[in-house]
């Protein structure tokens, strides 16, 4: 591709409204342009990368036995009513009516459509298992779209759905998708980690996320230092306490704490160790008999809201009680609540139940109890894992301790079970002629999100540093003062022809532009390999080659360049 015939659209300045590196560089490199909040057009450079990502995803899905289809982005609202998600999904689901006053949605996901399709097309167990996928635009009306295509309202996604008669075949397909996803991200040259995950609003039981590792990642990954165990922080299991509860050595006493409304203030003002304090959090209950529930975590721990949401006594989705509700039920504000004499169900994290001589609110404004002990000052309560894990704690497989890394979720696989097939009565006849509800799996890859995640992981102060497999172009040709030298023009044209015929994707900068601008654009675009041609190179018979990732420069004889570049690709 000649730059003179191409829509390059690079920018020198970093856009003021772009918060993360990928958004900044996608705008500066002329990959995308904003049309409205969370809506972007892909310019040629961005589309080339997007298509390469798509191609790898498609090849690996096909290799794993999945079959490609295409479903509509616009979906009948009736299907969402049938599964109950019309009401459950919330305002992210963009709804509208057509001229006949029929309800429709812009699809954020396609479980309803695919289940409706399969219940009409598949009737016998002999047609199963079946794994269908599409690469399609999705729409979620995010309340605050941000980070460019990382969290946009409209995005491109590969979503696959499998249908099964038995758990055994669901397990097999799930493992095949796990392997396919690992192959996808490996082929793209990305550092990634699969982790155990919560199923969220999609539902189901077993679930893994695939994260591209990046310091800017929104998700916190907890992984084992001694094994392959890894989980999203929401899913990571906290270890059970190994030490027994200590003996009571302090008497229960009430302390005036008018200026200590937080754990940090209590620790600072009264010198109590933070691990000897507890936080009491009041949430909405799941029943009329218990409209409020108290959750207890140690002062140095954080409540895991995903775990808390799954507690039987707690209303889902999790909702914290308001100040007025708390004051009406307890007689004190949020900064003075504690479990002693609290008249509501209490669930404590396992670590809280082995505490002794601890401090908590006294359920009276401006007062705390110190020296609280279980079975003396209050009865033991229900225990559960309701906290986030901490670095250095033992992992559940017993093979190491937790360490943390940040990641960007780019893939998610689920075993849905019969959640959607049962709701929509998607059945087949088994070998005995008996009707059976199908089991389902679903498997998503954020195609457009991968582009941004790859940039977050691969960039430097000069721009993007693309892995070769998804770079918009693989080789750049930079002729110095081409329009002043016929020799440079002829040599550059011949090289462009030679490299193109050899199968390289070449960006040939044939503009009448200053060398500094040409170099800056090539580095901003992140082209992995650059070849420089000037009169001096022609005199010596060697090209100047530069590797974008390492910055290393090498002089390569004219006749050896093609073989040299092929060797670089094999190494990459």
Swiss-Prot record:
InterPro entries: aa-tRNA-synt_IIb (IPR002314), aa-tRNA-synth_II (IPR006195), aa-tRNA-synth_II/BPL/LPL (IPR045864), Anticodon-bd (IPR004154), Anticodon-bd_dom_sf (IPR036621), Pro-tRNA-ligase_IIa (IPR002316), Pro-tRNA-synth_IIa_bac-type (IPR004500), Pro-tRNA-Synthase_IIa_type1 (IPR023717). One of its GO terms (molecular function) is proline-tRNA ligase activity. It catalyses: tRNA(Pro) + L-proline + ATP = L-prolyl-tRNA(Pro) + AMP + diphosphate. The keyword Secreted does not apply. Homodimer. Consists of three domains: the N-terminal catalytic domain, the editing domain and the C-terminal anticodon-binding domain. PANTHER family: MITOCHONDRIAL RIBOSOME PROTEIN L39/PROLYL-TRNA LIGASE FAMILY MEMBER (PTHR42753), PROLINE--TRNA LIGASE (PTHR42753:SF2). This is Proline--tRNA ligase. It comes from Shewanella amazonensis (strain ATCC BAA-1098 / SB2B). The gene is proS.
């Amino acid at each position: 591709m000649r730059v003179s015939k191409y829509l390059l659209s690079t920018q020198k300045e970093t856009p003021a409204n772009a918060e993360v590196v990928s958004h900044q560089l996608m705008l500066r490199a002329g990959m995308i342009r904003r049309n409205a909040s969370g809506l972007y057009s892909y310019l040629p450079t961005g589309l080339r990368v997007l298509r390469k990502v798509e191609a790898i995803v498609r090849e690996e899905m096909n290799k794993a036995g999945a079959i490609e289809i295409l479903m509509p982005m616009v979906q009948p609202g009736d299907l969402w009513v049938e599964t109950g998600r019309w009401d459950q999904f919330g305002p992210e689901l963009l709804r509208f009516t057509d001229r006949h006053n029929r309800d429709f949605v812009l699809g954020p996901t396609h479980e309803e459509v695919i289940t409706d399709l399969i219940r009409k097309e598949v009737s016998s167990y002999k047609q199963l298992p079946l794994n269908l996928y599409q690469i399609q635009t999705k729409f979620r009306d995010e309340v605050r779209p941000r980070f460019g295509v990382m969290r946009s309202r409209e995005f491109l996604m590969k979503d696959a759905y499998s249908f099964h008669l038995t758990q055994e075949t669901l397990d097999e397909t799930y493992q095949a998708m796990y392997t396919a996803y690992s192959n996808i991200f490996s082929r793209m040259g990305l550092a990634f980690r699969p982790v155990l995950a919560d199923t969220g609003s999609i539902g189901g039981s077993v679930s893994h996320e695939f994260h591209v590792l990046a310091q800017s990642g929104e998700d916190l990954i907890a992984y084992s230092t001694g094994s392959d165990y890894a989980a999203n922080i929401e899913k990571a299991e906290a270890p059970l306490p190994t030490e027994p509860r200590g003996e009571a050595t302090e008497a229960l006493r009430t302390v005036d704490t008018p200026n200590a409304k937080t754990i940090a203030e209590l620790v600072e003002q009264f010198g109590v160790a933070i691990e000897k304090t507890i936080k009491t959090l009041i949430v909405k209950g799941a029943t009329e008999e218990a409209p409020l529930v108290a959750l207890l975590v140690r002062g140095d721990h954080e409540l895991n809201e995903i775990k808390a949401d799954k507690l039987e006594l707690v209303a889902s989705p999790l909702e914290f009680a308001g100040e007025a509700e708390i004051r009406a039920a307890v007689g004190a504000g949020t900064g003075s609540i504690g479990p002693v004499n609290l008249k509501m169900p209490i669930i404590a994290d396992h670590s809280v139940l082995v505490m002794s001589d601890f401090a908590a609110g006294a359920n009276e404004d401006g007062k705390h109890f110190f020296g609280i002990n279980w079975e003396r000052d209050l009865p033991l309560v229900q225990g559960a894992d309701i906290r986030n894990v901490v670095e250095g704690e033992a992992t559940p497989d017993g093979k190491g301790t937790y360490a943390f890394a940040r990641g960007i979720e780019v893939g998610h696989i689920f075993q849905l079970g019969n959640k959607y097939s049962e709701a929509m009565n998607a059945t087949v006849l088994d070998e005995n002629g008996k009707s059976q509800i199908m089991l389902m799996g679903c498997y998503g890859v954020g195609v457009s999100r991968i582009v941004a995640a790859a940039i977050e992981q691969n960039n430097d102060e000069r721009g993007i540093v693309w892995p070769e497999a998804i770079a918009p172009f693989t080789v750049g040709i930079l002729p110095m003062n081409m329009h002043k030298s016929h020799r440079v023009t002829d040599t550059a044209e011949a090289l462009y022809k030679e490299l193109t015929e050899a199968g390289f994707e070449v960006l040939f900068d044939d503009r009448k532009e200053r060398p500094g601008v040409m170099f800056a654009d090539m580095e901003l675009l992140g082209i992995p390999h650059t070849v420089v041609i000037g009169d001096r190179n022609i005199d010596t018979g060697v090209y100047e080659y530069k590797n974008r990732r390492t910055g290393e420069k090498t002089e390569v004889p004219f006749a050896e360049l093609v073989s040299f570049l092929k060797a670089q690709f094999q190494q990459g």
